[in-house]
Amino acid sequence: MEDGPSNNASCFRRLTECFLSPSLTDEKVKAYLSLHPQVLDEFVSESVSAETVEKWLKRKNNKAEDEPSPKEVSRYQDTNMQGVVYELNSYIEQRLDTGGDNHLLLYELSSIIRIATKADGFALYFLGECNNSLCVFTPPGMKEGQPRLIPAGPITQGTTISAYVAKSRKTLLVEDILGDERFPRGTGLESGTRIQSVLCLPIVTAIGDLIGILELYRHWGKEAFCLSHQEVATANLAWASVAIHQVQVCRGLAKQTELNDFLLDVSKTYFDNIVAIDSLLEHIMIYAKNLVNADRCALFQVDHKNKELYSDLFDIGEEKEGKPVFKKTKEIRFSIEKGIAGQVARTGEVLNIPDAYADPRFNREVDLYTGYTTRNILCMPIVSRGSVIGVVQMVNKISGSAFSKTDENNFKMFAVFCALALHCANMYHRIRHSECIYRVTMEKLSYHSICTSEEWQGLMHFNLPARICRDIELFHFDIGPFENMWPGIFVYMIHRSCGTSCFELEKLCRFIMSVKKNYRRVPYHNWKHAVTVAHCMYAILQNNNGLFTDLERKGLLIACLCHDLDHRGFSNSYLQKFDHPLAALYSTSTMEQHHFSQTVSILQLEGHNIFSTLSSSEYEQVLEIIRKAIIATDLALYFGNRKQLEEMYQTGSLNLHNQSHRDRVIGLMMTACDLCSVTKLWPVTKLTANDIYAEFWAEGDEMKKLGIQPIPMMDRDKRDEVPQGQLGFYNAVAIPCYTTLTQILPPTEPLLKACRDNLNQWEKVIRGEETAMWISGPATSKSTSEKPTRKVDD
């Protein structure tokens, strides 16, 4: 043990003296180590790890095994190859059946041909993406860190010999490539040794498809290839191509049998369990991926009415128990005019795209949405009764640069069955949709009824007191104390805003009283709230006279009165979370779409169609105004709408003559009216907040019964957090809403001022201060700087 350090020092001293010599060369080092092997032994034992030594031994053994015997070489030099063809066939079949890589298999066969032709080396090329370029194949482990297919250049003449052969598909034997002007770049290889003689052969399948190029070469000074070498190489490649084709045909037949078995299996699955249609679609998509060896799969259905493609089932690229996972998420839609899927849906043609981003038809929106990168696509239409009802899209071939013709043919047959499955799915969806409509309708009819003749006749003869006629013009007017007059207040507002002859009075009274009947007795979203919202819209229209058309004024006032029809006191998220039939009917803006549906239902009742005097085009217009206005009360849509309006206002691009801009402004007006309780006098605002939270807490109580913890806003156990919650609501929602509205419609500034006053009151509540406030006396919504004041206490 003590001799170790001195021996090591001696070893390294001798090595150091050797390596520091100014005339040191590789030959001198090798010569020195040959004469002093103990130095190498000492150096390796002390400085080289056991893993490295093991790697050297493995490489040496592999090299020895790779070198064939003269007898074995002679077998492959027989151009008839009867002695090895069956062995070759068996070898290829075994490799392919066990999932062997075609590229690696051809590389191994090329190595045999190199030995048989006594070449110094070879290069194997395969076609790149789009089949217009070549890539050099590098087997794994040969050069660590390098890809298996390295781009070598385009397929064209006037560059390299491999590109020339790929272009012409003819074998070339060149004795001296350096002197051949057809190949200015020679072989294009960097072998470290000058190449002189080259034998370059195309690798062609039995059906004539080019799959690669084999380039054999000999170094400078060696004997050039001759015709016999060409014959040996050609014979070997020909037999290899036939063998590969034969095995692939057998595999295709096996695949066909597997496909037939699968179709029978899916048929049984469908008829045994028709309810689980999503499971059926997943089953189909999983097999489609395996059929063409794709990385991702997507199935889009066609909405011919709106000319859109849509999907809610996505391949997220994960696996569970060896099977792909498909996730059902929020539905995405895009125009049928966009993308490769849209092209297939429009034309009904199959598209095989080897390079997606190089194709101008490719729609990158889906990649941006999912964060996935699409390289190549195989897209197939699903046709039923002569019409494209869906599109199946395979994305990114896993093994190979692109989807092949075989993939395309197999997929065509598979798409026929997809059409049957999708047709059945659509039929089942329509049945389910009808069942949901029926259940909701029966529930509604069991609760609601049409107004009596006494109710609407009493309204026809009602006259509003003069004092209320004055106060109704104020933005902060409170209808609360006048419950029996609410229907009459709405009739008055209609006549003041639209004229006394705008509707038949009898139909108008029937309509109003039936709308009242269809509001449920919930704490907040009730008949009182409907009239309050309608009054705020009335005040906005009156203070912006001449800005809106007669149809818009009629439609907006009716929309406000009906905007919460048949509200159950539960939020959209609650209905969707617990699979309420309404959520099945309307996937987005659930309650808002139901409110509009109820509005149309009342209009269709006998004697209730207040728009019956309009022309058909005007009738469609006013219904669309009402629909858009009611949908706009979905607070989830408000944030994006207000942001767009703010940007347009700041940039000066807002144009009220532009219909889309006008729709956005009306949407903001509807939100402002829906939230108008925050613009009333403080006592009214405070009482309304109590009603709102009573409804929230009732929903929270229901969630607790089901074992779900509600959000703090809906938890009555956290009522102490109400003032702080209101502060956040005012700052995040109400103040921005009325600020943007005031910018666009300046006469609505009193709404913003009142909202800020109430924000101050909530801040006082948080600080524990008195919340009495001074307000203006009887006045209009204009300046009140010289009006008498009065004190209002909570």
Swiss-Prot record:
One of its GO terms (cellular component) is extrinsic component of postsynaptic density membrane. GO terms for biological process: cAMP catabolic process; cAMP-mediated signaling; cGMP catabolic process; negative regulation of cGMP-mediated signaling; regulation of adenylate cyclase-activating G protein-coupled receptor signaling pathway; regulation of cAMP/PKA signal transduction. Pathway: Purine metabolism; 3',5'-cyclic AMP degradation; AMP from 3',5'-cyclic AMP: step 1/1; Purine metabolism; 3',5'-cyclic GMP degradation; GMP from 3',5'-cyclic GMP: step 1/1. It is found in: Cytoplasm, Cytosol. 3',5'-cyclic AMP binds at R296, C297, I340, A341, T374, Q393, H525, Q726. Detected in striatum and testis (at protein level). Detected in whole brain, hippocampus, olfactory bulb, striatum neurons and testis. Binds 2 divalent metal cations per subunit. Site 1 may preferentially bind zinc ions, while site 2 has a preference for magnesium and/or manganese ions. A divalent metal cation 1 binds at H529, H563, D564, D674. The active site is at H525. Residues 452-769 form the PDEase domain. Its cofactor is a divalent metal cation. Its EC number is 3.1.4.17. Inhibited by dipyridamole and moderately by IBMX, zaprinast and rolipram. It comes from the Eukaryota. It catalyses: a nucleoside 3',5'-cyclic phosphate + H2O = a nucleoside 5'-phosphate + H(+); 3',5'-cyclic AMP + H2O = AMP + H(+); 3',5'-cyclic GMP + H2O = GMP + H(+). GO terms for molecular function: 3',5'-cGMP-stimulated cyclic-nucleotide phosphodiesterase activity; 3',5'-cyclic-AMP phosphodiesterase activity; 3',5'-cyclic-GMP phosphodiesterase activity; 3',5'-cyclic-nucleotide phosphodiesterase activity; cAMP binding; cGMP binding; cyclic-nucleotide phosphodiesterase activity; metal ion binding. 3',5'-cyclic GMP binds at H525, Q726. InterPro entries: GAF (IPR003018), GAF-like_dom_sf (IPR029016), HD/PDEase_dom (IPR003607), PDEase (IPR023088), PDEase_catalytic_dom (IPR002073), PDEase_catalytic_dom_sf (IPR036971), PDEase_CS (IPR023174). Its main location: cytoplasm. Induction: Up-regulated in brain after seizures. Up-regulated in the hippocampus one hour after induction of long-term potentiation. PANTHER family: CYCLIC NUCLEOTIDE PHOSPHODIESTERASE (PTHR11347). Homodimer. This is cAMP and cAMP-inhibited cGMP 3',5'-cyclic phosphodiesterase 10A. It comes from Rattus norvegicus (Rat). The lineage of its organism: Eukaryota, Metazoa, Chordata, Craniata, Vertebrata. The gene is Pde10a.
